[in-house]
Amino acid sequence: VLFPSRDGTPLSGWWLPQPQPRGVAVLCHGYVANRCEVLGVAIELHRMGFSCLLFDFRAHGESGGHTTTIGIREVQDALAAVDFVARFGLPILLFGSSMGGAVAIMAAARDERVGAVITDSAYARLRWAADTWWEAGFGRVLGKLCRPVKYLALLLTRTRLSDAEPIREIGKIAPRPILLIHGDRDHLVPVEHAYALYQEAGEPRTLWIASGSGHVQARVDQPENYYGQVSKFIDQWLEARPAHESLHIGPGEITPG
């Protein structure tokens, strides 16, 4: 499928319909990845009864655009994906991996049509994450010396690191539920990001720390536990919805109670 971002950037994706859907899931991939990164998650969500939209963020995969902002303008892409699926009148789940998780938080905070959020290895503040990436790539001393380079990138994209701070927006998601997943051996986005996000999230909120897993690796290392957490979260979310909002008879139809 093809659809425009909120600012007109052309986006490319895959639509995986369910004949009798429980809801619809929008899946957001990570930085320097594409929709294939979350295909495995989409397959599992499809098995759980969800129609799924996987798409490439701007400047990734087959989508248009030449510049990534690592979560800042990508929120416009996620909101456009929500626009795309909202026509079906089904409960909307946002799933995001790494950068996509941060984007999912900010998009859900700004759009009440999103009913629930699941993130995997999301950053709390882009500034914190960027500092970690510099040190991971160049070492602690050289990484700190190279940090000013990021300000050149911000100047070229006319953005600010403070434009991507899910920690400031996550509280707006409540009373809609959120599940935060993070590996305790994540060296790209340390687990402290998850604790910080959880602290600021409203109820209902769930934090699952995947013991021994690195960045977005929990679903590979321990898939049964991972998808068990996801399935339990989804069941609780849908069961808590008013009956008139959760009776479906087709891929885009709802019968009022």
Which residues fall in each region the model found?
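N-terminal cap/lid segment of alpha/beta-hydrolase-fold proteins
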Residues: 1-20
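The serine-hydrolase catalytic nucleophile loop
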Residues: 31-44, 57
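Catalytic nucleophile-loop/oxyanion-hole region of alpha/beta-hydrolase
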Residues: 48, 60-91
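Hydrolase active-site cap/lid region
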Residues: 109-163, 168-171
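Short beta-strand/loop motif that positions the catalytic acidic residue
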Residues: 173-174, 179-182, 186
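Conserved alpha/beta-hydrolase "acid-adjacent" motif
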Residues: 187-193
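Catalytic histidine neighborhood in serine/cysteine hydrolases
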Residues: 198-216
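Catalytic histidine-centered segment of alpha/beta-hydrolase-like enzymes
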Residues: 213-227
